[in-house]
Amino acid sequence: MHLQRALVVLALLNLATISLSLSTCTTLDFGHIKKKRVEAIRGQILSKLRLTSPPEPSVMTHVPYQVLALYNSTRELLEEMHGEREEGCTQETSESEYYAKEIHKFDMIQGLAEHNELAVCPKGITSKVFRFNVSSVEKNGTNLFRAEFRVLRVPNPSSKRTEQRIELFQILRPDEHIAKQRYIGGKNLPTRGTAEWLSFDVTDTVREWLLRRESNLGLEISIHCPCHTFQPNGDILENVHEVMEIKFKGVDNEDDHGRGDLGRLKKQKDHHNPHLILMMIPPHRLDSPGQGSQRKKRALDTNYCFRNLEENCCVRPLYIDFRQDLGWKWVHEPKGYYANFCSGPCPYLRSADTTHSTVLGLYNTLNPEASASPCCVPQDLEPLTILYYVGRTPKVEQLSNMVVKSCKCS
């Protein structure tokens, strides 16, 4: 008897396949979607900043050049990080991804030379040392989320070679006057060509500096095999030292000093100098019960929807203007951004050899009021960088998962 009932239900399911071929999720008109999306974004931004209400608009009308440079550098860095994740097909699953990060920029400082040079290899011809003072954020050191070392490679027209390998090291305290270093990463770079920013992940190194100030002896970029020049067959060329022919802005361009206006002109040049960008999670945004465990993982990115007129589930463009749509004047940059949204029917694909689809269809038939069919939801999201004021204090922060880049049926 039970077997006969099951067969009847499955027969009805086959007849109902066409009617179940589209998602049962409600299709909304664009105006309603935008209204809901705007309200969601309003709540997201305030939540990620741990604000109960929008800050009062600042009386400051001019954004300092250094702050604007930090904002632009952060945007560039996030774009690079997203590109690396695309190439590596990696996913970010940390719960700390959700909350906004405070952005701190530390320019290179001129420090005293440490006793860590090779006896026959003076620094300057085989390597460059970069030192930074990050003591101002030590009290929040355990909440470091990400640290990037950025340096601008500039072309060297007089270079004798077209390419050279460089390696980045963390300088360690010497042991019995023997130089010690910790390898961080390496790159093969052109010596000429156009200028380009180089980025290195130095999160572990900076975290160590923040926890133990005495360990902060700086970073060093060195050529791959210092103090040796190799012939094409691999033999060492005696008494000839390979020198670093890669040039860096702010380190090798000494001709910039002493020329022009020392005020605004110098400030404009400074943002091209070597620097660290630190992303910190403020303590008050952590350890909140009930938060984080419900956050979604990131997924792979796709630009398919912007290249094709897809009627089914896809990401749709939606521009949010902070002033017009949210009524906010406290966000200085950007003026708005493409938040996007997911929309479109999800085809209900069911085949005879798909047990999951059969069970899902059976459940949907027996529970007509339930929504067991897949809905079009965000799959991949990107962060947004904003510049805003709290009183007269400018802040640059990264807000995670604010831009919908792709969708999926789930």
From Swiss-Prot:
Keyword NAD: no
Protein name listed in UniProt: Transforming growth factor beta-3 proprotein
Keyword terms, alphabetized: Cleavage on pair of basic residues, Disulfide bond, Extracellular matrix, Glycoprotein, Growth factor, Methylation, Mitogen, Secreted, Signal
Family per record: Belongs to the TGF-beta family.
Motif (Cell attachment site): 259-261
Annotated GO CC locations: extracellular matrix; extracellular space
Stated role: Transforming growth factor beta-3 proprotein: Precursor of the Latency-associated peptide (LAP) and Transforming growth factor beta-3 (TGF-beta-3) chains, which constitute the regulatory and active subunit of TGF-beta-3, respectively.
PANTHER family documented for this protein: TGF-BETA FAMILY (PTHR11848), TRANSFORMING GROWTH FACTOR BETA-3 PROPROTEIN (PTHR11848:SF34)
Signal peptide residues on this chain, from the entry's feature table: 1-23
Tissue: Expressed in mammary glands with a slight increase in expression prior to lactation and again increasing at the onset of involution, expression peaks at day 3 of involution.
Lineage: superkingdom: Eukaryota
Keyword Secreted listed: yes
Residue positions with a glycan: 72, 133, 140
Post-translational modification: Transforming growth factor beta-3 proprotein: The precursor proprotein is cleaved in the Golgi apparatus to form Transforming growth factor beta-3 (TGF-beta-3) and Latency-associated peptide (LAP) chains, which remain non-covalently linked, rendering TGF-beta-3 inactive.
Residues bearing the modification N5-methylglutamine: 291
Positions of disulphide bridges: 305-314, 313-376, 342-407, 346-409
Biological process terms in GO annotation: animal organ morphogenesis; cell population proliferation; cell-cell junction organization; cellular response to growth factor stimulus; detection of hypoxia; epithelial cell proliferation; face morphogenesis; filopodium assembly
Annotated knockout phenotype: Mice display a cleft palate caused by defects in medial edge epithelial seam degeneration and palate fusion, leading to death within the first day after birth.
